[in-house]
């Protein structure tokens, strides 16, 4: 085994002031491949070009991304939300579905501007989170779920039931476990009650829409009424939790970055959609706090270039995007959308491996929502900046939550701005 990083722990086990900095310090001391013993778990971290390529190439049946994701999310979410699901988040992005989501985004943007009025102040990430809730709930939570008090109740419930807390606030997971996930279970019950009402409206109107909500309803059609309603609601809940929070955070960062780069902002407002997508890619790349991890299910070999390590079952193999994305080549710590050509880095040959830098992941870790996410972020930034002149209140670039080790960064504190119709 590689050297152990003694004294290094992960934030769901021990107090860590900055989770990414802790792993960076271990890398500086021990090199690109090292082991961490945190709590009851063993981790093998790799950052070498060959090691990262080997990591992305691990067979799922031996070293599972799905199991690693589940083990992460269950720190926050009640176990019952995972049991017996029939329509899973991986089915979200069929081409005909995506067209409907973008239509719902347009409606959500119009509702958002109606709420904002002609002027005021807001927090960037509150705005994008609420927008993500509205678009998502309109797309898969049934009739009436994205309007009025029903929407507000669902948005509050999903803010409590945010699975991303497992990696955004991992230091809070001990308290979540100690409470037996009381708040999360109450929020899930609230979602179930509201979605059940939407199903009853659906049944009463004899709807036959084959969009995502219709497919969820159909999947539970043979079950007794109580099981059917709860099954539909839990499918909706897991889909929403798995799909929206990182997109909302990424949109927040591209708004922040464009406000800090007025020349690029002017071109986006003028209709340069290619630049808008490249800005979205670059902001997402720099905002990544993702720990990419695989839970080892059967013995597997990891080639790091110098040595091949035999990793036993029960270990986790991992790499960390915020370290790779900013250190694989000079200048990567800076925001520069011109480093992208369409969805790819323009100068991949400057990297020791193209696998070392990413906005949306590689291989099994690639986000299936990338095309949709880029279209959605482009539509949202174009709409919002086209309607409003925005003046940020922050004086230094917002920082991510220090304990976060996963997903797209959440801001560590308010990011307020003033806006006026322009």
Mark where each language-model region is:
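N-terminal membrane-proximal hinge/A-helix region immediately C-terminal to the signal-anchor transmembrane segment
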Residues: 1-72, 356
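Conserved cytochrome P450 K-helix E-x-x-R motif and the immediately C-terminal K′/meander segment
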Residues: 12-25, 271-309
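Cytochrome P450
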Residues: 38-41, 45-49, 67-109, 116-134, 146-152, ...
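Cytochrome P450 catalytic core segment centered on helix I
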Residues: 156-225
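Central I-helix of cytochrome P450 enzymes
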Residues: 191, 219-270, 377
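Conserved cytochrome P450 K-helix/beta-meander segment immediately N-terminal to the heme-binding cysteine loop
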Residues: 319-348
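Cytochrome P450 heme-binding "Cys pocket" and the immediately downstream C-terminal segment
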Residues: 372-406
């Amino acid at each position: 085994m590689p050297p152990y990083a003694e004294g290094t722990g992960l934030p769901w086990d021990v107090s860590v002031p900055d989770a990414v900095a802790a792993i960076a310090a271990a890398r500086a001391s021990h090199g690109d491949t090292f082991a961490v013993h945190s709590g009851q778990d063993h981790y093998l971290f790799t950052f070498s070009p060959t090691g990262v390529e080997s990591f992305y190439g691990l067979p799922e049946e031996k070293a599972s991304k799905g199991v690693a994701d589940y083990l992460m999310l269950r720190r926050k979410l009640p176990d019952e939300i995972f049991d017996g699901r029939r329509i899973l988040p991986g089915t979200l992005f069929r081409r005909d579905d995506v067209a409907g989501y973008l239509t719902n985004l347009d409606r959500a943007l119009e509702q958002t501007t109606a709420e904002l009025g002609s002027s005021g102040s807001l927090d960037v990430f509150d705005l994008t989170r609420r927008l993500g809730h509205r678009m998502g709930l309109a797309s898969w939570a049934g009739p009436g779920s994205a309007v009025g008090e029903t929407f507000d109740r669902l948005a509050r419930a999903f803010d409590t039931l945010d699975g991303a807390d497992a990696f955004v606030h991992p230091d809070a997971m001990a308290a979540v476990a100690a409470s037996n996930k009381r708040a999360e279970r109450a929020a899930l019950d609230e979602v179930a009650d509201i979605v059940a009402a939407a199903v009853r409206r659906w049944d009463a109107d004899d709807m036959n829409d084959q969009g995502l909500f219709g497919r969820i309803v159909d999947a539970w059609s043979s079950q007794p009424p109580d099981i059917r309603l709860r099954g539909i609601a839990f499918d909706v809940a897991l889909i929403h939790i798995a799909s929206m929070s990182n997109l909302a955070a990424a949109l927040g960062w591209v708004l922040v970055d464009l406000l800090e780069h007025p020349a690029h902002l002017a071109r986006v407002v003028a209709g340069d959609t290619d630049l808008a997508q490249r800005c979205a890619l670059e902001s997402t790349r720099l905002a990544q706090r993702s720990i990419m991890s695989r839970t080892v299910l059967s013995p597997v070999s990891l080639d790091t270039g110098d040595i091949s390590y035999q990793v036993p079952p029960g270990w986790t193999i991992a790499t960390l995007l915020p370290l790779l994305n900013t250190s694989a080549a000079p200048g990567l710590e800076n925001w520069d959308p011109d480093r992208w050509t369409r969805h790819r880095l323009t100068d991949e040959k400057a990297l020791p491996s193209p696998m070392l830098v990413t906005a949306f992941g590689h291989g099994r870790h690639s986000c299936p929502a990338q095309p949709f996410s880029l279209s959605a972020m482009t539509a949202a930034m174009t709409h919002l900046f086209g309607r409003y002149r925005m003046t940020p209140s922050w004086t230094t670039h917002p920082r991510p939550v220090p304990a976060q080790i996963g997903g797209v960064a959440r801001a560590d504190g308010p990011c307020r701005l003033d806006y006026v119709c322009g």
